[in-house]
Amino acid sequence: MFHRPALQVFRQFARCQSTDSVILERSINKVQLLGRVGQDPVMRQAEGKNPVTIFSLATNELWRSGESETFHTAGDVNQKTTWHRISVFRPGLRDVAYQHVKKGARLLVEGKIDYGEYTDKNNVRRQATTIIADNIIFLSDLRDKL
C-alpha cells in the first residue's frame, strides 16, 4: 500500500542528491503593484519581435517620523515614490493596456519581475528591471469622479 509513494519519495531524493543531473524544483516570481500611471503607454516593436506596451507605475510608501508612529498624532509624514517600468506582452492584455491605460489612472498590476540588459546608444551596457504584466485591474477612486 505505501510502497509506491515511498518509492516516489526515494526517487525524488535520489534526483536531488545527484550532482550530474539538473534539479527541477518549483519557484515563485510574483509581483503585485498598486499605484498610479506616470504617463500614457507606448507600444514598441523591434524588428522580427512581438510588440510590447510599456508604461510607468508609481507606488508610494508613507511613514511618520517623530514621537508617534501612528498617523493620528504629531510627527512628520514622509513619503517615498518608487517608479516601476511595466511591460505588457500578452496580445489581448497588451492591446487593452495600450488603449485604456491613461496617465494618473489607478491600477493593480500583477506579474513577474525581470532583470535584463541592453546596450544604449553610446554602446554602454545597462541593467534594466521590468515588471512583466500578466494581469491589469483598473481601479477608480474619488479623483476619477471629480
Curated annotation (Swiss-Prot):
Classify the main location: mitochondrion
Tell me the residues of the organelle transit peptide.
1-17
Subcellular location(s) of the protein? Mitochondrion; Mitochondrion matrix, Mitochondrion nucleoid
Which residues fall in a coiled-coil region?
A: none
Q: Which UniProt keywords apply?
A: DNA replication, DNA-binding, Mitochondrion, Mitochondrion nucleoid, Transit peptide
Asked if the keyword DNA-binding belongs to this entry, the reply reads yes
Where does the SSB domain start and stop, copy by copy? 28-140
User: A Gene Ontology molecular-function term?
Assistant: single-stranded DNA binding
The residue ranges crossing the membrane are: none
Q: GO biological process annotations for this chain's record?
A: DNA replication; mitochondrial DNA replication; mitochondrial genome maintenance; positive regulation of mitochondrial DNA replication; protein homotetramerization
Alphabetical list of Pfam families matching this protein: SSB
CDD domains attached to this UniProt entry: SSB_OBF
Task: Determine if Mitochondrion is one of this entry's keywords.
Answer: yes
A single Gene Ontology CC term: mitochondrial nucleoid
- Function according to Swiss-Prot or TrEMBL: Binds preferentially and cooperatively to pyrimidine rich single-stranded DNA (ss-DNA). Required to maintain the copy number of mitochondrial DNA (mtDNA) and plays crucial roles during mtDNA replication that stimulate activity of the DNA polymerase at the replication fork. May also function in mtDNA repair.
How does this protein assemble?
Homotetramer.
* The protein's name: Single-stranded DNA-binding protein 1-A, mitochondrial
